[in-house]
UniProtKB/Swiss-Prot annotation:
Signal peptide: none annotated. It is found in: Cell inner membrane. PANTHER family: 4-HYDROXYBENZOATE SOLANESYLTRANSFERASE, PROTOHEME IX FARNESYLTRANSFERASE, MITOCHONDRIAL. The keyword Transferase applies. Converts heme B (protoheme IX) to heme O by substitution of the vinyl group on carbon 2 of heme B porphyrin ring with a hydroxyethyl farnesyl side group. GO terms for biological process: heme O biosynthetic process. InterPro entries: Protohaem_IX_farnesylTrfase, UbiA_prenyltransferase, UbiA_prenylTrfase_CS, UbiA_sf. PROSITE patterns: UBIA (PS00943). Its EC number is 2.5.1.141. The lineage of its organism: Bacteria, Pseudomonadati, Pseudomonadota, Alphaproteobacteria, Hyphomicrobiales. Carbon 2 of the heme B porphyrin ring is defined according to the Fischer nomenclature. This is Protoheme IX farnesyltransferase. Keywords: Cell inner membrane, Cell membrane, Heme biosynthesis, Membrane, Transferase, Transmembrane, Transmembrane helix.
Length: 312
């Protein structure tokens, strides 16, 4: 079941404010998601084998941030009807009546187009086209096509959130390779455990909005089993940079420890057999997943700077 697109956002929200605030527009950008996008893109750009002019590097990261923000605004524009239904999202600017759908759409389109044009004009067109494809994938493939149709929405659509380190890499090198693809795979495999653990303690919200998340469609047991499965795949991918010699021993040790802890949480979630235990472990798994991804990419960055210092 999905909420009809014809459903007026105003039907469950306040009247549109005459003057949206700067904060309202910032909220449209999904700033917390943008931080993750910017950080992983920055790591991809810095650890690539080619040094980029700092000014062009700054422009590249700015374009990725602006493009990600534009995509976030377009996502909120399209999902305004279901955002109005969900407790977690009904205070967003459009369902709350702070910004009109039309303004949000124009805002998102302008940011998305500008980010691609500036990236292409000042950095390189390969990275710009990669950025354009990522925005398209997030809005059209994930938001419009998959999100309301299949419980695999997160698995396939998660690619959009995994592309930023490859875009950062492409901004510096003008191409992509196996190392950048490994960075993509880490985030791609991380996405299902992250979002499905969230959906386990937010299933009523998703059910009310008619979004076919895994717990609502396949059930709690299947969801927990798949969280464990994808966590193991993610751990294997996280070991990849060390295995191929892209990352050193420092990364290898710490990424292994972090992956074991993540698998431990996912295993305990899978074995939980009461409602309270499931909710508790789902929350622990979700919040650890946030730390895990930041730590994995942070370790890569720290190790890179340590090696630079040693070489100098």
């Amino acid at each position: 079941m999905s909420i009809p697109r014809e459903l007026s956002v105003a039907s469950g929200s306040k009247s549109i404010s005459p003057k949206p605030s700067v904060y309202d527009y910032i909220t449209l950008l999904k700033p917390r998601v943008m931080l993750l996008v910017v950080f992983t893109a920055l790591v991809g750009l810095i650890v690539s084998p080619v040094s980029i002019n700092p000014l062009y590097g700054f422009l590249a990261i700015l374009c990725i941030a602006v493009g990600g923000g534009g995509a976030g605004a377009l996502n909120m524009w399209y999902d305004a009807d279901i955002d109005a239904v969900m407790e977690r999202t009904k205070s967003r600017p459009i369902p709350a009546g702070k910004i009109s759908s039309r303004k949000a759409f124009i805002f998102g389109m302008v940011l998305s187009i500008l980010s691609v044009l500036i990236m292409g004009s000042f950095v390189n067109w390969f990275a710009a086209l990669f950025l354009a494809f990522t925005i398209f994938f997030y809005i059209v493939v994930y938001t419009i096509w998959l999100k309301r149709r299949t419980p695999q929405n997160i698995v396939i659509g998660g690619a959009a959130g995994a592309f930023p380190p490859m875009i950062g890499w492409a901004a510096a090198t003008g191409t992509v390779n196996i190392e950048s693809f490994l960075l993509f795979l880490i985030i791609f495999m991380w996405t299902p455990p992250h979002f499905w653990s969230l959906s386990l303690f937010s299933s009523l919200d998703y059910d009310a909005a008619g979004i076919p998340m895994m717990p609502n469609v396949r059930g709690e047991h299947s969801t927990k089993k798949q969280i464990l499965f994808y966590t193991i795949l993610m751990a294997i991918c996280a070991a990849g940079p060390f295995i191929i010699g892209f990352a050193g021993v420092f990364y290898g040790i710490f990424s292994t420890v972090l992956s074991i802890i993540f698998i431990h949480f996912a295993y305990r979630l899978w074995k939980s057999n009461t409602y309270d235990a499931t909710i508790l472990m789902a929350k622990k798994t979700f919040f650890f997943s946030l730390f895990y991804l930041a730590a994995i990419f942070g370790i890569l960055l720290i190790e890179f700077f340590v090696w630079c210092f040693i070489i100098l």
